[in-house]
Amino acid sequence: DCLLSRGLGDVYKRQPTFTLNGRLIIVMWMSGHPGNRRQWKAEMMTAATHLACVARSQSMGNGIPGLQKRKKRIMKMVLFYTLHTTKRRRNMKKQGFGTTKDGKEALLYTLSNKNGMEISVTDYGAHLVSVLVPDKDGKKRDVVLGFDSVTGYETDGSHFGATIGRNGNRIAGAAFELHGKTYQLAKNENNNNLHSGPDGYDYRLWNVEEADDSAVTFVLMSPDGDQGFPGNFEVSVTYTLTDENAVEIHYEGSCDQDTVVNMTNHSYFNLAGHDAGSIENQTLVLKAEQFSPVIDSASIPIGEHAPVQGTPMDFTSEKAIGAEIEADFEQLKLTGGYDHNFILDKAVEGSIELMAVASCKESGITMEAFTDLPCVQFYAGNFIAPVTGCLLYTSPSPRDKRQS
């Protein structure tokens, strides 16, 4: 039946719906994907979450056309950031964000919610550019690090707010083996590959598939052999700002071959504001009782898990980020501070659960981070001076010392 009869507005009146386990499902037609592949997008809309799954359109029969799962090569990851602050109509703004080195125009999309919170994202690298949050006094603070135009993102190597792909984090020796074949990647950090090399997805202009008052979806086609990875890989990333002050980041992708995929967002957070100085007095809780020790300063894990208890790596209870960062502890000395993988205490594998809580007493801003992945990399911004911010990006568990 029609969503108009459910009181959800004229804009949805052509969209078919049904209910599942007491939840309303909206079926929306998606087009414009490379290769003209037809797809249906089924979205569950609840007060606090936005969960999406994609299915290939196989038939036009009765009921929900083609609502069949794709083959095994489906990648879906979800990351939520919820910022708590101390009513306004939604709207989306689109404006120029400068011109790239090859003469293409980049665009900036700004979303706002009824609480006065705003986020800005750009089609260049699908970057999260800014997150403006009212503090305890109602003053807006930009709590992520970034630049005012596309030029900064083209020239800086810190990956502020970047959508990293095809693989986030490090691959030792810049090579991996899959099904008996060795794939060589670019060596862009010592002898290793970091964030897929110098031609990462964050240095490309993405296509905008959808943009409305609450969400923007960027899409990219990465061909077989791109960056050295096998398979034609189609990926989308959707940024959503909710009225619950949640920034939701959804990744969806498919590939025609087995490949390595580890998409992530690379935003640095300073909850006092991007220009407020040190984060050492801001506090952090990580839902992780184990971490991955590294071999050396290259931050490649040794392939084992170690307990955080009794070490400076223990953030299981609230602790200032700078409290033990200079402790006489080998792992911190190797990496110049925190730059380690933490294994999350997941109640249910693959479920969306709280992974971290960061707080700033001075601003009154608290951020909760949720993910459906098993690990989080915590980087305290050891080498991004003069600005300061901490980075939390999610990932699968490192399999051995070959991959971080």
Regions found by a protein language model. Give the residues of each.
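Short hydrophobic targeting helices and cationic amphipathic motifs
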Residues: 34-37, 51, 81
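Alpha-helix boundary/capping motif
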Residues: 31, 46-47
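Intrinsic disorder/low-complexity segments enriched in small, polar and charged residues
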Residues: 19-22, 55, 60-65
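Short, Lys/Arg-enriched N-terminal segments with co-localized hydrophobic residues
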Residues: 70-74, 80-91
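Single conserved hydrophobic/aromatic residue that forms the stacking wall/gate
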Residues: 1-15, 393-404
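An exposed, glycine/acidic-rich loop-and-rim segment of catalytic or binding clefts
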Residues: 92-395
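Serine residues within intrinsically disordered or low-complexity segments
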Residues: 31, 57-59, 397
